[in-house]
């Protein structure tokens, strides 16, 4: 077990990790296996977005598992290595000499290094019943959940590259795919548009927005669509709606510590190293092309090992 030092009444850790998703928990596992004292701070529940996935079937070595169960397994493995945890949202990280002061609403902590693994939230439509229908006809990830609707009728809402990619993926496995966008023109890649629009099982609905959900037995039955040009409303029966209207990284409060892309992601390399020595980034909040469970785990391992090299003076 590693030694945790105290400066006054404040515990000093080798590494504090902000965020308890797959990236954060993986970072904790790697750091503890390297003999570092670790505190992981998570504001809600462990597992991040994966905890809400009905099934996970694209993670090597695990053919099929519930997202919440997989998150619990990760947590158990981390705790078995004596990583410490506390409940709290990290509000600020400030340099304190050679160390860092980390503040939450309820506490102050200190560490020699910090890993920001705060993730990125899928932007929601903000409609009534949207949260309740998650896993019951509403999804934010076709890669994760598309296979559950093989030969079914699905819809994708969004106008960017991610929406086009989701619709392309679904068109390979679903009988019918509707692509819904509030404008006539799409922002996404022209080549993707051409490929998608050429597919016979894809129907494009524009300019349309989703005005509401129709449910049956607590599951999605149909979408209420509104034509943004005429105001006319129609119903569209679907088995699942895939919401692809962008993601929102949660790094605004740390903007002074690291460079951000125009979309708000951390513009840092795979090692997670930032211009501030001792501060690292991992997971979906890092600027990258692919955001999946496997890439989050990879980020967590990379950031933890980079942090350990920093602490050991091996940069």
Language-model features: locations:
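Short, Lys/Arg-enriched N-terminal segments with co-localized hydrophobic residues
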Residues: 1-11
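Phosphate-coordination loops involved in phosphoryl transfer and adenosine-cofactor binding
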Residues: 12, 87, 150-152, 207, ...
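Beta1-alpha1 glycine-rich phosphate/pyrophosphate-binding loop at the start
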Residues: 13-81, 158, 162-189, 261
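A Rossmann-like FAD-binding core segment of flavoenzymes
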Residues: 78-103, 108-111, 171-268, 309-315
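Glycine/small-residue-rich loop that forms an oxyanion/phosphate-binding "nest" at active or ligand-binding sites
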Residues: 85-105, 109-147
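FAD-site-proximal beta/loop scaffold in flavoenzymes
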Residues: 126, 132-148, 245-292, 299, ...
């Amino acid at each position: 077990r590693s030694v945790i030092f105290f400066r006054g009444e404040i515990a000093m850790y080798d590494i504090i990790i902000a965020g308890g998703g797959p990236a954060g928990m993986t970072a904790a596992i790697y750091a503890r296996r390297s003999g570092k004292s670790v505190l992981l701070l998570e504001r809600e529940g462990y597992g991040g977005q994966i905890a809400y996935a009905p099934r996970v079937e694209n993670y090597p070595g695990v053919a099929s598992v519930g997202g919440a169960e997989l998150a619990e397994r990760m947590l158990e493995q981390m705790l078995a290595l004596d990583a410490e945890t506390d409940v709290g949202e990290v509000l600020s990280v400030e340099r304190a000499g050679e160390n860092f002061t980390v503040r939450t609403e309820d506490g102050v902590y200190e560490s020699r290094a910090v890993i920001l693994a705060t993730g990125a939230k899928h932007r929601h439509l903000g409609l009534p019943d949207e949260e309740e229908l998650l896993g019951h006809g509403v999804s934010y990830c076709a890669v994760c959940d598309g296979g559950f609707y093989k030969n079914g009728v699905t819809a994708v809402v969004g106008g960017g590259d991610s929406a086009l990619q989701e619709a392309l993926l679904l068109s390979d496995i679903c009988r019918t795919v509707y692509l819904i966008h509030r404008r006539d023109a799409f922002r996404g890649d022209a080549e993707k548009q051409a490929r998608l629009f050429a597919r016979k099982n894809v129907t494009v609905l524009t300019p349309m927005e989703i005005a509401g959900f129709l449910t049956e037995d607590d599951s999605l039955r149909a979408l209420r669509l509104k034509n943004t040009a005429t105001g006319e409303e129609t119903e569209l029966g679907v088995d699942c709606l895939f919401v692809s209207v962008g993601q929102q990284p949660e790094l605004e409060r740390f903007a002074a510590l690291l460079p951000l892309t125009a979309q708000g992601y951390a513009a840092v390399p795979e090692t997670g190293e930032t211009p501030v020595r001792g501060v690292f980034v991992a997971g979906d909040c890092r600027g990258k092309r692919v955001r999946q469970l496997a890439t989050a785990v990879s980020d967590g391992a990379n950031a933890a090992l980079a942090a350990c090299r920093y602490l050991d003076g091996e940069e």
